[in-house]
Swiss-Prot record:
Cellular component aspect of the GO annotation: plasma membrane
Miscellaneous information on this protein: Bacitracin is thought to be involved in the inhibition of peptidoglycan synthesis by sequestering undecaprenyl diphosphate, thereby reducing the pool of lipid carrier available.
Compartments reported by the entry: Cell membrane
Membrane topology: Multi-pass membrane protein
Lineage: Bacteria, Bacillati, Bacillota, Bacilli, Bacillales
Name assigned to this protein: Undecaprenyl-diphosphatase 4
Length: 259
């Protein structure tokens, strides 16, 4: 893989990690486009580190607060919200890894993501702010996050959807969703590093790794800040239409043996 391909994959990871359209699904498509095999595993890990950097930079005040107040309500909300994904991930890791490798269900998963985005957008706007979020809210939102273990089910999409259903206001829904992404991204990095150390990753140039990581961080930061502002006044339907169109295209290509 050359540095330009890594740069493009970094853009894909950075934008789609925080837009509700599935980063894993788009990375799968990107690897298919560039004819990369499972190999890009180490690059995937570095791309996740890039988006993690984006979250850390955007939420630097919150993370400083969490470090100083490790038993705060916010920390407990993040822990409670992360439990479902941890349980599902540990129990079914191998099963979902096999699904991710084949990509056979990816078209259907994009359609499912679109359905949830479309339906959630019809909900009346809630009024809950960060201080109003309950542990029950966090657990339910985290349970929706666990569904994103399917490669083309959007993590940010599902958590924003759940947050809107739990009557968080639109800005807070996106804000909490991205904050909750931190433990999930860290978990993904740990699991990927475990595979890397077991020799499942290809050799890739340091230049490509650095370019991909910085690209993911830069575009991830843009996506976080833009999405929070966008959701204040705009609909999720445009994202639903996009993933529906993408899902239909993929299913058509699979049906005709083109993909």
């Amino acid at each position: 893989m050359n540095w330009l391909e890594a740069f493009i994959l970094g853009i894909i990871q950075g934008l789609t990690e925080f837009l509700p359209i599935s980063s894993t699904g788009h990375l799968y498509l990107g690897r298919h486009l560039f004819q990369l095999d499972e190999a890009g595993l180490f690059l995937d890990t570095m791309l996740h580190i890039g988006t993690l950097l984006a979250v850390f930079i955007y939420y630097k005040k919150e993370f400083i607060y969490l470090i100083k107040n490790p038993f705060s309500k916010l920390m407990l909300l993040l822990i409670v919200g992360t439990i479902p994904a941890v349980v599902i991930g540990l129990l079914f890791k191998d099963f979902f890894e096999d699904i991710s490798k084949t990509g056979i269900t990816i078209g259907w998963e994009f359609l499912v993501t679109g359905f949830f985005l479309y339906v959630a957008d019809k909900q009346k706007n809630g009024r809950k702010k960060m201080g109003d979020i309950t542990y029950k809210d966090a657990f339910i939102i985290g349970s929706f996050q666990a569904a994103a273990i399917f490669p083309a089910i959007s993590r940010s999409g599902m958590t924003i959807v759940a947050a809107l259903w739990r009557k968080l206001d639109r800005e807070t829904a996106a804000y909490f969703s991205f904050l909750l992404s931190t433990p999930a991204i860290v978990g993904a990095i740990i699991l990927q590093f475990a595979d890397v150390f077991q020799g499942k990753a290809e050799s890739i140039s340091s230049t490509s790794l650095i370019v991909g990581t910085l690209s993911a961080a830069f575009f991830g930061y843009i996506a976080v800040s833009w999405m929070i502002q966008y959701l204040k006044r705009h609909s999720l339907k445009v994202f639903a239409y996009y993933v529906w169109g993408l899902g239909i295209l993929i299913l058509t290509l699979q049906f005709t043996d083109v993909f």
